[in-house]
From Swiss-Prot:
Name of the protein this chain belongs to: Stigmurin
Keywords: Amidation, Antibiotic, Antimicrobial, Fungicide, Secreted, Signal
Record note on pH: Stable to pH variation.
A GO BP annotation: defense response to fungus
């Protein structure tokens, strides 16, 4: 190989290595962000389910009161 090709190859390897190291340094933060987003969404889903359960209990209690008020035929 000529020296010109070796220098070009060397610079190409340096550029690729720099880009890869930047990409690999982003991976832990990306994974952490995905995990925290999933946990946050899961907490929101659980809190929404709790609210739905409370609303269901309120509706059942109101329905029982309404049925108690109806006359028996």
């Amino acid at each position: 190989m000529q020296i010109k090709h070796l220098i070009t190859l060397f610079f190409l390897v340096l550029i690729v290595a720099d880009q890869c190291s930047a990409f690999f340094s982003l991976i832990p933060s990306l994974v952490g962000g995905l995990i925290s987003a999933f946990k946050g969404r899961r907490k929101r889903e659980i809190s929404a389910q709790i609210e739905q359960y409370k609303d269901l209990q309120k509706r059942e209690a109101e329905l029982e009161k309404l049925l108690d008020r109806l006359p028996m035929y």
